[in-house]
A protein has these predicted regions:
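Structured, solvent-exposed hinge/loop segments at the ends of secondary-structure elements
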Residues: 2-4, 8, 51-175, 179, ...
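Membrane-helix entry/capping segments
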Residues: 1-19, 24, 28, 32, ...
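Short, strongly hydrophobic transmembrane alpha-helices
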Residues: 28-62
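Transmembrane alpha-helical interface segments in multi-pass membrane proteins
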Residues: 34, 340, 356-401, 421, ...
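A hydrophobic alpha-helix feature that marks transmembrane segments and, especially
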Residues: 51, 330-357, 370, 437
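Short helix-to-coil transition segments within interhelical loops
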Residues: 26, 350-353, 359-368, 444, ...
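C-terminal membrane-exit region of the final transmembrane helix in multipass inner-membrane proteins
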Residues: 421-454
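Mid-to-C-terminal secondary-structure elements
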Residues: 138-152, 163-317
Length: 454
């Protein structure tokens, strides 16, 4: 016990000694030290700001459940009309309803976006146009949507095409001042709807569940949700992506019935599959469903289906903006350029002290001691660069909206992990940059130095 304590005390004493030498060296070479600190701080800060944006854009939007959520795809376009053999990212009405009615998953959800004219139940507010989603009732439970008041509607409401609606907290504040509005009515497109739930502030980023049907997955959240069956019954047109192949019926789709019976893809679908066995079973069901469509003559090509998890789906849809990925690459390149310059500056710093190294070696200092001394000095400089990097990172986060899209910039946050990573990057980069200069310093021959300075 005492031997270990003495060894620890001796190590701490040596570390203090090395830091003292580093401090003296920095005071002797103030300009070089300041330049190295500036380079490390700028390089680390640039990387961290870009990383914060990339992390926000590429983050798992529902990490506690993403392994259970999947997107089914069915190729109803055929090899002559699909994209490089891949099925459409959305489903036709025929396939979407078949999926919903089959109930082969724990939960299944259909989604399509639309615009609604909202008129509150009083004369104090003017009508407004709001973005909404038509969804099946499992939507709120599947995606763990938080409610401030009330809840979602029931399966029977779906079956009865009930005139019910769930509104966002923002719309509730606008119409009812944030009060509990459950049970009250609003008009949507001149039809009365009863409010059954008010969502809490909820905006998954990216909005992964309808990323295939929206133009931009980082846009503002939907303001209202109505039953899918109700929207279909009212012939509510989709305001989001609508894909038709050249083999679809009349491409202009003159009426609602034509839309429902066409091979156009416009409905997003999700299924919840808790276990791996459920995933395999559902994948088999998808294949068998497509094979049945081929057998009855609807498809004249072999089954072509996909079942993708959240992470894979976001990659397929290329959700991470190219600007954020490119910015990260450029920032890392800038850090590498800084490192190259730091290597040269540290080499100049260390080799100017060759006489000092020669004297220390002549007095019995080992090469290991020289390594420890100069790497400690590099770590101290890196730590100073990290502190500067923290300030520059905070400053960069303030002006981040001027470089990146505002919708993505608002997602980037300066948290404790980013602060720690900034310092860690600066210290690590400084140590890496010091390896070659330290090796050169340790090769100094004491006899030659003493003779040349004699």
């Amino acid at each position: 016990m005492s031997r270990a304590f003495r060894a620890a005390a001796r190590g701490a004493s040596l570390l203090t000694y090395y830091f003292d030498l580093a401090w003296r060296s920095c005071r002797r070479s103030k300009a070089l030290t300041a330049l190295v600190v500036l380079l490390m701080g700028c390089g680390a800060a640039t990387c961290m700001v870009s990383f914060a944006v990339f992390r926000a854009a590429a983050a798992d939007p529902i990490p506690w459940k993403s392994q259970q959520l999947f997107v089914p795809q069915i190729d109803n376009f055929g090899p002559a009309h699909n994209w490089k053999g891949e099925p459409p990212t959305l489903l036709s009405y025929t396939d979407a309803v078949a999926l919903l009615q089959a109930r082969q998953a724990r939960r299944q959800v259909l989604i399509y976006g639309s615009k609604w004219t909202v008129l509150p139940g009083d004369a104090q507010h003017l009508p407004s146009s709001q973005e909404g989603d038509a969804v099946s009732h499992d939507f709120f439970a599947m995606f763990d949507a938080p409610f401030r008041y009330g809840g979602g509607w029931s399966a029977s409401d779906d079956e009865q095409r009930a005139a019910v609606v769930v509104i966002s907290s923002a719309l509730n504040r606008k119409l009812f001042g944030g009060a509990n509005s459950v049970g009250r009515e609003i008009e949507l497109d001149a039809h009365a709807y009863r409010i059954v739930g008010v969502l809490d502030d909820w905006n998954p980023s990216p909005r992964f569940f309808d990323v295939s049907s929206t133009w931009y997955p980082f846009s503002r959240p939907r303001q209202l949700y109505v039953p899918f069956s109700r929207a279909i019954d009212l012939h509510k047109a989709a305001s989001t992506n609508f894909y038709c192949s050249t083999n679809s019926v009349d491409p202009y789709l003159p009426n609602w019935d034509s839309i429902l019976h066409s091979e156009c893809a416009w409905i997003a679908a999700w299924v919840e599959l808790p276990r791996r066995a459920d995933v395999e079973r559902y994948r088999d069901w998808l294949h068998n469903y497509a094979a049945e469509q081929q057998r009855v003559g609807r498809f004249d090509w072999p089954p072509n289906v996909r079942l993708s998890g959240v992470g894979q789906w976001l990659q397929i849809m290329k959700v991470v903006p190219k600007s954020s990925a490119l910015s990260l690459i450029v920032s890392v390149s800038f850090l590498l350029i800084c490192l190259v310059n730091v290597v040269g500056l540290m080499l100049a710093r260390f080799m100017r002290r060759a006489p000092e190294i020669g004297v220390r070696r002549a007095l019995g200092a080992s090469r290991g001691a020289i390594y420890r001394q100069f790497l400690t000095e590099a770590a101290a400089i890196g730590l100073a660069g990290g502190v500067l990097g923290l300030l520059l990172t905070a400053l960069g986060m303030v002006g981040i909206g001027k470089v990146f899209e505002p919708e993505i910039a608002r997602l980037a946050t300066l948290d404790a992990s980013l602060l720690l990573l900034t310092v860690l990057v600066a210290v690590t980069a400084s140590l890496v940059a010091a390896l070659y200069p330290t090796w050169r310093a340790a090769q100094v021959q004491p006899a030659w130095q003493l003779k040349s300075n004699g």
